[in-house]
Amino acid sequence: MDRCKHVGRLRLAQDHSILNPQKWHCVDCNTTESVWACLSCSHVACGRYIEEHALQHFKEQHHPLALEVNELYVYCYLCDDYVLNDNATGDLKLLRSTLSAIKSQCYEVTTRSGRTLRSSSANGDQLSPSTQELQLRDEDRMFTALWHRRRALIGRLFRLWFAQTERGKKRLEEERQQEEEEERKREARERRRQLKRQLKEELESAPPRKSHRIRRQSLKATSVKPARAPAKSTKSVRRRSAPARVSTPTPRTPRERTPQQRPRPQAKAKRPQAPPSKTGDSPVKRRPTVTPGVTGLRNLGNTCYMNSILQVLSHLHVFRECFLRLDLNQALELLASAVSRKLGLSAQRVIQPKGLNQGSGLSGGASRSRNMELIQPKEPSSKHISLCHELHTLFPVMWSGKWALVSPFAMLHSVWQLIPAFRGYAQQDAQEFLCELLDKVQHELERTRTLTPATVPANQRRLIKQVLSVVNTIFHGQLLSQVRCLACDHRSNTIEPFWDLSLEFPERYHSNSKDAAQVPCGLTEMLAKFTETEALEGAIYACDYCNNKRRRFCSKQVVLTEAQKQLMVHKLPHVLRLHLKRFRWSGRNHREKIGVHVQFEQELNMEPYCCKDSGNLPHPQHFLYQLSAVVMHHGKGFGSGHYTAFCYNTEGGFWVHCNDSKLSVCAVEEVCKAQAYILFYTQRNAQDKSKESDL
């Protein structure tokens, strides 16, 4: 619509909630796909093709204008059309330019009138990252407290309801009888303890027995009689009786000692007794109120791609355990000092006091790094930011069993600094982020190991080497590329590494046919297509066997023949990543999403897709894989959408649907019905080894 009369009445507030990237999701269903922000209030909800929460808000509040956060379209519900015009002050144009600046993190926005509209949550000048992180941490505490309060109320209501049922009454009667039995046992133990204390006090306060008095008198008599003997015999008797005289105080029994000589039992008797508990004397261990791993990650502004990948990596047992043990604080400090020496920062020697010990203090050289930061420029250097350190910090919080929600602000800040392609609040691809993240983590570990081999402690060097080995091998596999010449039947083999398998859909799904979109596709069919034999177009292959008799100085041309090519798996990784290429080209430059459902099973046998010509065939158990995680893309296109993940929780033995801050337990049948984008399968042999290491 060229002219909408409702836009002229628009009065946009300076501090609208749409300027906060953390609000770019539906407040009802938490999706980031097709999110519309009301221009009359701070409400943000999903469009009519998702759950119609924005339309429902219009029906309740009668606010006609809404703006799509990602595409920046303005829609009027009263006119039932898109709006093309603007108001007199140009608020819509200014709002679009401000949102574009927030997404790209470029805040140089100017207007003809000089008016600016800034985002208080995304502008680095008004709100530093540390202050924003503190605000998010307070919100996380409040969310966790509300979660605990809600769970306690639900548990109390359930217990009240259960107490009214027949089964509940029976259980309460059994618990009451058990408590009475425990109370009787406790009273009996208390009576025995009291009787024992009384006997001890009576024995301590009673005079020594007659037998002991007679024995002491006899000992004194024997020690006095030798004094009347001659001098020679007296010396000999004294030598024999001296040990007896020294050892006489030592054989005293507790009955002979006075209360002044036994302060410990008296103090122990005066020690106040703890109040008895209803369940007995054994202390009850307090369980974590949140299951480890069931911790949501706050959406900081179209960061669902990062949250889904972090949830998957944290639920991979081998990957998680490595970063839980890894601590690169000391290594990073040494790395920073090495970098500063390379840059020629000689001013550091002048700033540091002469008597300062670099290794003194509990921080182990924190003063050195603090002084080094004083002479560095204000812009943070990417060499001092570590994704490994952020993973080591984030994973323990997610698996502590204490937090229901965590804001990964530090992780996002590190990603912005180290991977500039993901800087800003624009929507990104989860597969690309996973590849870039693993590549940066691998390079960090390699740089840490090579630059500081002698200064890092031996145990840390071994741990860094182990983690690097796990990161390099957990997703690493090998492909066998085999080309067969059709003229001489000679086969040329090439080994190529891979970290994931990008599987294409069959040809029938690359058309706009509605019948093909309704028929589901199987994962085994896509794997068979990946490993099928394909014919090279025309005579384009220069066979080595056909041209081996030709010399380099020969003037004859190289013989080109027809050939066939096939890809097969030569070495399987511990964790198999299957990337489903859900796009097709429509026209020259337009990509569409293939929204067909892919049928995948909980167990996967990779033996049909591995090469069988190699002499060292692995054990049949190595071909079996178990489903560990699924990343899903919700939406019709690649320019917009929402990412969630299904992850298998090894601690609880159940599946969890991770939708940013909202996590819910689900069944495996629901997982298999998901529209998968990335599949993670863990080798069953590797799972058994991880379980044995835990035991």
Curated annotation (Swiss-Prot):
Zn(2+) 2 binds at residues 26, 29, 46, 53. Residues 295-684 form the USP domain. Pfam families: UCH, zf-UBP. Residues 198-294 are annotated as: Disordered. The active site is at residues 304, 642. InterPro entries: Papain-like_cys_pep_sf, Peptidase_C19_UCH, Ub_carboxyl-term_hydrolase, USP_CS, USP_dom, Znf_RING/FYVE/PHD, Znf_UBP. Residues 209-218 have a biased composition (Basic residues). Its EC number is 3.4.19.12. This is Ubiquitin carboxyl-terminal hydrolase 44. It comes from Danio rerio.
